[in-house]
A protein has these predicted regions:
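Short, solvent-exposed loop/turn and secondary-structure capping segments
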Residues: 46-52, 174-176, 196-197, 244-245
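Polysaccharide-binding and catalytic clefts of secreted carbohydrate-active enzymes
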Residues: 30-152
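The substrate-binding groove and active-site-proximal loops of carbohydrate-active enzymes
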Residues: 1-18, 71, 104-119, 159-168, ...
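Glycoside hydrolase catalytic-domain groove-lining segments
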Residues: 112, 116-202, 217-224
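Aromatic-rich peripheral "rim/lid" segments of glycoside hydrolase catalytic domains that contact
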Residues: 53-66, 235-281
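Active-site clefts of carbohydrate-active enzymes
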Residues: 1-6, 96-111, 144, 180-219, ...
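Substrate-binding cleft of secreted/luminal carbohydrate-active enzymes
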Residues: 31-35, 39-41, 137, 196, ...
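Aromatic-lined substrate-binding rim segments of carbohydrate-active enzymes
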Residues: 1-29, 122-132, 156-157, 177-179, ...
Length: 281
């Protein structure tokens, strides 16, 4: 599932982040809590899509006003902008009221402002997290798979630790795009089997519970072998209900079943891994 992108210039954006953090105030002050993920697997669209979506928004969209400010500074007037874009604008109000996409002449501007939007999202989210508790780490937004270079670079600039959800057999050969150097936490990974529990195996399938435990160990060991990875975060602690969660997902991916009974193979694998971590790295 890809979650919709929110307008970082809207007053409700920072308030929403703060409200979400405050709702987890008890966890935030737990000594075992190192930080927070904010958001999950956002839909960033293509290289210029964020700017295009902003142009197609109504006149009262705060991001559209920010785009207008940026363009006015770059071109001096909206008629001059219209000449470049191949879309006549009489003035700022005309620009704000239009939802039509411009011509090929807008290509560079759309890409540049999309990058600005991405940076603003991470900057404002970091501000909200640090205002809530400066000691907590901002763990990013759990990027899905391999994010575009622009997203990865902005994330690395503003996050204490960058989170990626990477569903693979192993990640020892995974590297940052564009040669970026920043600490990475795996936000999600799992393996599922259908010999016990619900009927869904999740993203990565195992033959049975023994095979699942071996695959889990292989993934964690590959993370230990990758110097850019500082942690892995299993998805999820318990199996999902056979009747499905809010979107119908029902996976056998937990360390415990739906009756909170541990899978002994998983527990044994975790215990073995815990004994290896500090001698390995």
């Amino acid at each position: 599932m890809w979650w919709k992108f929110r307008d970082p210039w809207d007053d409700s954006f920072a308030k929403g982040v703060t409200a979400a953090l405050e709702a987890h105030g008890r966890e935030a002050h737990d000594p075992w809590c190192i930080g927070f993920f904010v958001d999950n697997e956002i839909n960033w669209g293509g290289p210029s899509d964020l700017a295009k979506w902003i142009l197609q928004s109504p006149a009262d969209q705060p991001a559209k006003a920010a785009f207008a400010d940026w363009l006015a500074k770059a071109y001096g007037s909206f008629p001059a902008l219209g000449e470049k874009w191949g879309r006549p604008y009489a003035d700022r109000a005309d620009f704000m009221g239009s939802v039509a996409l411009p011509g090929e002449g807008a290509k560079d501007d759309l890409y540049k402002f999309s990058c600005i939007v991405i940076d603003e999202y991470f900057r404002r989210t970091r501000e909200a997290v640090k205002a809530f508790d400066p000691q907590l780490l901002y763990l990013g937004c759990r990027l899905a798979g391999h994010a575009r270079d622009e997203v990865a670079a902005a994330c690395a600039r503003h996050c204490d630790v960058v989170s990626y959800n990477i569903y693979r057999e192993t990640i020892d050969d995974w590297r940052w795009p564009g040669g970026i150097d920043a600490p990475v936490m795996i936000g999600e990974f799992h393996f599922g089997a259908t010999d016990r529990g619900p009927f869904g195996t999740g993203v990565r399938q195992a033959d049975n519970q023994v095979d699942r435990a071996e695959k889990m160990k292989g993934y964690v060991r590959s993370a230990l072998a990758n110097p850019q990875i500082v942690g892995v975060h299993w998805h999820q602690f318990s199996d999902q209900a056979t009747s499905g969660r809010f979107d119908g997902e029902y996976l056998q991916v937990g360390w415990t079943d739906i009756c909170d009974t541990p899978y002994p193979e998983a527990v044994s694998a975790l215990r073995q891994l815990a004994g290896e971590i500090y001698s390995t790295r």
